[in-house]
Amino acid sequence: MSFSLSEWLWQETYWLPPNVTWAELEDRDGLVFAHPHHVLAAFPVALVLVAVRIVFERFVALPLSRWMGVQDPIRRKIKPNPVLEKYFLRMKQCPEETQMVLLASQCGLTLRQTQRWFRRRRNQDRPSLSKKFCEACWRFVFYLCSFVGGTSILYHESWLWSPSLCWENYPHQTLNLSLYWWYLLELGFYLSLLITLPFDVKRKDFKEQVVHHFVAVGLIGFSYSVNLLRIGAVVLLLHDCSDYLLEGCKILNYAHFRRGCDALFIMFALVFFYTRLIFFPTQVIYTSVYDSIKNSGPFFGYYFFIVLLVMLQILHVYWFCLILRMLYSFLHKGQMTEDIRSDVEEPDSSDDEPVSEGPQLKNGMARGSRVAVTNGPRSRAAACLTNGHTRAT
């Protein structure tokens, strides 16, 4: 049954150009071709990368974060409250004021105490700054190594600089051993991201990230299986050349190296704009749509590949809109603000709560208000702003 299902799934009419058979892509006379079963090796590679990541973050990234001065904000523990906890988990993490008043009366607390409980409870679920730093550090190292390795493998290939050449003699293109290992590592890495997805930092674009990881795995696995290695390698290298810049920018941001972060972010925005909004659609997608079927008609695999590329491009446009928002803030404020995709740590001081105005006293202050203390202790999150740095996210 499984054998017949496999035969049905990998029918030549689905995935290969017309009049091309799998038999033509069998290894012969010293020629080696890509085969679908090769991608199965990516699963153990993914598990190895997960193990390497755990060791790297524990013994390299975490000590590096301490050396660079990354400190987690102090979070005060909350008192257990079954009523508020049940509402927090099942209903809403940020109740409206009317609901907050009702919850306060049910628990015998004041409105301020209830607001403080929810604020501290939200902070409790937010990832620590050191966790964000370690995650960014791991991705920076992998993307940088992948970019350097991919560049050394593809630099002398003519089809890298002219993607239309990717379709010469397709699909009868032999497999380069170094390209195979690079492809395998890339596929294993994105599979490892799917494995660690429940434990990684969840940003506001979490759903888009999940879609991206699945599209990336689909593109890498499919392009290898049907011998679309050349155009697939171009896509991978285009992404690696900007991804390591983004992760490096995050590292500097978490360490409060403001000038370095600003400069690196501008460089990242320029590289992202050219590679993903100019080169990718005008060269990669264009040649995949038109040049790939010059010598054959369209088929199911052709449409499947184009759909994946278009989905990737839609994500590129979405993320560039976020980049533009951050650049707009940079041009108006003169420095980078926090990553708009991230959750910001809420201040833990009770002085930050909104207080209703009371009767005015003779000195012009409202009853119940407090004088701001300028030299008193503050939370670490607030201290990050007094020295000119932005709050890291």
Curated annotation (Swiss-Prot):
Its EC number is 2.3.1.-, 2.3.1.24. It is an enzyme of class 2 (transferase). GO terms for molecular function: DNA binding; sphingosine N-acyltransferase activity. Pathway: Lipid metabolism; sphingolipid metabolism. Residues 341-393 are annotated as: Disordered. Residues 345-355 have a biased composition (Acidic residues). A motif (Last loop motif) lies at residues 291-301. Residues 131-332 form the TLC domain. Residues 1-31 are lumenal. The chain crosses the membrane at residues 32-52, 140-160, 179-199, 217-237, 265-285, 304-324. Residues 67-128 are annotated as: Homeobox-like. Residues 325-393 are cytoplasmic. Glycans are attached at residue 19. Phosphorylated at the C-terminus by CK2. It is a multi-pass membrane protein. Pfam families: Homeodomain (PF00046), TRAM_LAG1_CLN8 (PF03798). GO terms for biological process: ceramide biosynthetic process; sphingolipid biosynthetic process. This is Ceramide synthase 4. It comes from Mus musculus.
